[in-house]
Amino acid sequence: MGILGLSKLIADLAPQAIRESEIKNFFGRKVAIDASMCLYQFLIAVRSEGAQLATVNGDPTSHLMGMFYRTIRLLDNGIKPVYVFDGKPPDLKSGELAKRAERREEAEKALKAATEAGDEAEIEKFNRRLVRVTKEHAREAKELLKLMGVPYVDAPCEAEAQCAALVKAGKVYATATEDMDALTFGSSKLLRYLTYSEARKMPVKEFTYEKLLQGLELNQREFIDLCILLGCDYCESIKGIGPKRAIELINSYRDIETILDNLDTSKYTVPENWNYKVARELFIEPEVADASAIDLKWTEPDEEGLVKFLCGERQFSEERVRGGAKKLLKSKKAQTQVRLDSFFQTLPSSPNAVAAAKRKAEEAKKSANNKKAKIGGGGGAGRGRRPK
């Protein structure tokens, strides 16, 4: 699910935190990619005549087709991807998973009704809703990546949290996912639409964590509380509080505890036994592997291994697979080129660095306001940060 309404809230209140770019602008960058999100996209999008691609035995291959060609496209553009796979979900996510199971059951009933009615559009719609990534899909994707010479990481828990840890450690430039909670986990950069097909012509949307904190006038902890109010995977949200009201409350009271002390409970219903404190801790200290100990290596592809794995039973075109393997080899050799900024040291990001950048921005803002006052500048008061 990610964080409900966060993307629009940032666009409205901190537009300076978002930049749209062409994929080629990320040449030379290492990027941690949410593998489960990608596989889900491929299972839905890579289809023939409305159905998933499959072997003669009916086993799906859409996820492998998508992973193979989209990864080649990234490498063609000089991007070095590392795929991060989900581990076990945290216990606090069980409520969200139960809701997903209910929605799946409803979709199955709707699909049955659409099939009986012969409504092809509805059949396709509900078939897509029933798509889910299995352990077998993930296992096959890992085998494919190994043959392609592309590294992957098995996260102990949430993939987005592990991606954020790799970014913080300076191992990669950004997290690539469609789930906004990568920012809640503290990833300094988030890339959306990076793995979309070229045909969709979607520019890559880059979010910068420090700039969104400055634009929203929040620190890391306050931003996490905002995300919990908006709605996350780990606990329910307060009914009746949408994005606009959530940011107003955080700006006024700075944390959920103080909000609850001042909330009009005749208007808003707080969930019973609300686990917001545990959710907050999951975002602050998620279960991740030590990123500094992870060694990321991009190696040469195994062309014969790829042909054996993808052709035959999986029915990929041998000519196209060999062509893809040659592109992989070519991009591996081309990666000797480097970005100019790679000559400078990349330091791991930290909450202290974010706070320092924020203080610097606030000091610059105060200085500018003082200068305006001296020369008589001014129309009304600007939007200031309320005291904690």
Swiss-Prot record:
Stretches for region Disordered: 355-388
Binding site for Mg(2+) 1: 34, 86, 158, 160
Pfam families reported in the protein's UniProt record: XPG_I, XPG_N
Binding site for Mg(2+) 2: 179, 181, 233
Family classification: Belongs to the XPG/RAD2 endonuclease family. FEN1 subfamily.
Region (N-domain): 1-104
Positions that bind DNA: 47, 70, 158, 231, 233
SMART domains cross-referenced by the UniProt entry: HhH2 (SM00279), XPGI (SM00484), XPGN (SM00485)
InterPro entries: 5-3_exonuclease_C_sf, Flap_endonuc, HhH2, PIN-like_dom_sf, XPG-I_dom, XPG/Rad2, XPG_CS, XPG_DNA_repair_N
UniProt record, GO biological process: base-excision repair; DNA replication, removal of RNA primer
Subcellular localization(s) per the UniProt record: Nucleus, Nucleolus; Nucleus, Nucleoplasm; Mitochondrion
Protein name (database record): Flap endonuclease 1
Annotated stretches, region: Interaction with PCNA: 336-344
Cofactor (UniProt): Mg(2+)
Statement: the UniProt record of this protein carries the keyword Phosphoprotein: yes
Keyword Chaperone: no
A GO term, aspect molecular function: 5'-flap endonuclease activity
Subunit structure: Interacts with PCNA. Three molecules of FEN1 bind to one PCNA trimer with each molecule binding to one PCNA monomer. PCNA stimulates the nuclease activity without altering cleavage specificity.
Post-translational modification: Phosphorylated. Phosphorylation upon DNA damage induces relocalization to the nuclear plasma.
Region (I-domain): 122-253
Range of residues in the leader sequence: none
A single Gene Ontology CC term: nucleolus
Gene3D superfamilies linked to this entry: 5' to 3' exonuclease, C-terminal subdomain (1.10.150.20), 5'-nuclease (3.40.50.1010)
Cofactor binding remark: Binds 2 magnesium ions per subunit. They probably participate in the reaction catalyzed by the enzyme. May bind an additional third magnesium ion after substrate binding.
Enzyme class: hydrolase
Coarse class of the protein's main subcellular location: nucleus
